[in-house]
Regions:
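Acidic, surface-exposed loops and disordered segments
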Residues: 1-130
Length: 130
């Protein structure tokens, strides 16, 4: 499901805050890291590899977005925040996932504020099997 309506985004953030009263309110309000569009990806609970399929879908969304100049980020925390309490159940119902499906991943989309150079990588962390 794609959510780009700011009012709906705020409703979801408010539900996260209500479901986690001990969480810093700013953290709850920032759970989507400022992304103006969120894609909520659901998995088929009856298929044990469906989470991998969701990951591949998220990757394709992110690569496609980047090809059009749109930044993206894969977020797991909102999944936990939305599924570990009863206060968020109305939000999940509003997303309207089919019977037998559950929220698996969130992908935030938007135009990046910055484009830093890639950090140096340590090639020694890669192990080649001969």
């Amino acid at each position: 499901r794609v959510v780009d309506n700011p009012a709906v985004m705020n409703e979801i953030k408010d539900a996260v805050a209500a479901g986690h009263p001990n969480m810093d309110p700013e953290m709850a309000k920032g759970c989507f890291r400022g992304a103006p569009v969120m894609v909520f990806i659901a998995r088929d609970k009856s298929y044990d590899f469906s989470a991998y399929d969701c990951g591949l879908m998220a990757q394709n969304i992110m690569l496609s977005a980047w090809s059009m100049g749109v930044g993206s980020m894969c977020l797991g925390s909102p999944v936990r925040f939305l599924t570990d309490n009863d206060a968020c159940k109305p939000v999940l119902e509003r997303l309207g996932f089919s019977e037998g499906y559950e929220l698996c991943l969130c992908v935030g989309l938007g135009y990046a504020d910055e484009a830093p150079d890639a950090k140096p990588r340590d090639i020694n962390k890669v192990k080649f099997v001969e």
